[in-house]
From Swiss-Prot:
GO terms for biological process: transcription elongation-coupled chromatin remodeling. NAD(+) binds at residues 284-298, 518. It is found in: Chromosome. GO terms for cellular component: chromatin. Its main location: nucleus. Binds to mononucleosomes. Interacts with male-specific lethal (MSL) histone acetyltransferase complex at least composed of mof, msl-1, msl-2 and msl-3. It comes from Anopheles gambiae (African malaria mosquito). Residues 274-566 are annotated as: Dehydrogenase domain. PANTHER family: CYTOKINE-LIKE NUCLEAR FACTOR N-PAC (PTHR43580:SF2), OXIDOREDUCTASE GLYR1-RELATED (PTHR43580). This is Cytokine-like nuclear factor N-PAC. Belongs to the HIBADH-related family. NP60 subfamily.
Amino acid sequence: MSDSTGYAVNDLVWAKMKGFSPWPGRISVPPAELRKIAVKKNNPVKCIFFFGSNNYAWIEETQIKPYLQFKDTHLNSSKSAQFKEALKQIEEFRVNPEKFQPLFVGENEAANRPDPDEEFNRLREGVASGTEESGAEDGASVNNTTTPAVLESVDEATSTPMVKKSAKKKVRASLPIKLNVDKVVCESIITFQCSPRSVGNKAKAMLDDGVSGAPSPKRKKKLLNDSGELSSLDASPVRRNAPVTHLLNRPVTVTRPETPEIDMSSVSNAVQSRNIKASQLKFGFLGLGVMGCGIVKNLIKSGHSVVVWNRSAHKCRKFQEVGAEVADTPSDVVEMTDVTYSCVSDPQVAKDMVFGNCGVMSANLAGKGYVEMTGVDPETSNDINEAIISKGGRYLEAQIQGSKNQAEEGTLIILASGDRLLFEECQSCFEAISRNSFYLGDVGNATKMNLILQMISGITLAGVAEAMALADRAGLQQKDVLEVLELTNMSSEMMLQKGNAIIKGEFPTHHALKHMQKDLKLALSLADGLEQSLPITAASNEVYKHAKRLGYGSHDASAVYVRARF
């Protein structure tokens, strides 16, 4: 249904954002992320879904034009590849709107949420009904303390002018000290004073205008304490965002594509060609994340006996169907197996696996092996090593180099250090999940090597993202840039893969951006202890931190382009 402006949801339009040419878009229901952004514009605004970039933003109605009517005017307003992709998508939307429904999931969720104005009206009606019920039961006597009296006393306390110190007078409440207040109304008052700004301002206006009849100056709020007495308390300050215009002019983060479930029926050609002779030992695996799923699949397909555990138990079902056992806790995995692998998200979670409740240290570690595959710093690895050895166990750090695809194909690179005998016992597993495994000596060497390689990867990707952003702004075809790059000696599989993801504007997770930033942070920490300057790494780390703050932490690391582009 269209409103007074003539625009309705699903209308196709040209929307002009500050700093950009008119862009093909669609009038949309604002998703939850966009509703959180305060709109400080003089003119009415509409939520626009931008084709090509698949982003949302608030756009003033004065900057919106009907698509078909102004198509010829704006058709050549930009020469970028993303603009051409947007034109292609909007024409496809005109023919087959259902094809684009998966992109509008956030709108459907937002549509099911209660409207803030309706929620406010419900609260206001609750206050009004509470007033009537209280008045009917207790009458108008002040001694009986009706609900209107409570509201009047609160407003009186908040609207009384400030008394100068020289006057040496105190403002006292006119009501008796102990009050028997209707619980519903009391809760409503506190809710109004502590609610978010979008509702709180309306609530304050209602209390000021509807009860006292005049606006009150800014004062400390008078609230009722547990004993029913009026006390002066500082209400929690409402956070007021500064009017930062550039935040409104940046597209809202896109919904991260769901990671497809792993196909347990297939086996990669690389694994099949190796003729792996599986070890007779029993292996445990903690963590079935982006990398863990592919690793465990290849262990099972190569004939290894595996026991798995994951915080989200539903991820274990597919592996249980193909022969894996499922344990209830990390300590149970250790008890049931000879060697346990851990592959979780970060150093803190890795420590939780070992030292946490029902963790590895709760089990009998005598003669057992523990292999840490999580990307950690040398200090964390040494802490885990000392703990495992203190209980009679053996420790190996086996850092992995590669992405989700390489984990599923069994073509990772393993960097190991620690117990040499344990490294030899794990060779059949390493053969199933990697194309090469290296033993680097004492504990800590593998983690250092991994962080250095991640530095190279992170800095390179940040450079590719900035270069692609510049190419787009300069009017060059990003596809042409990649084609030329592929012919040079700078070309690499990673550059081309990430570059194609940037062109498509889709960032399915192969290596999460937050994990890349974590590795750069750990590398900087390592360098700080060695007093080694890393200015380029530090700058790259800030770029990833910014992209993560924009909401792209769970996207692929190539989403750092969004920060460079916008």
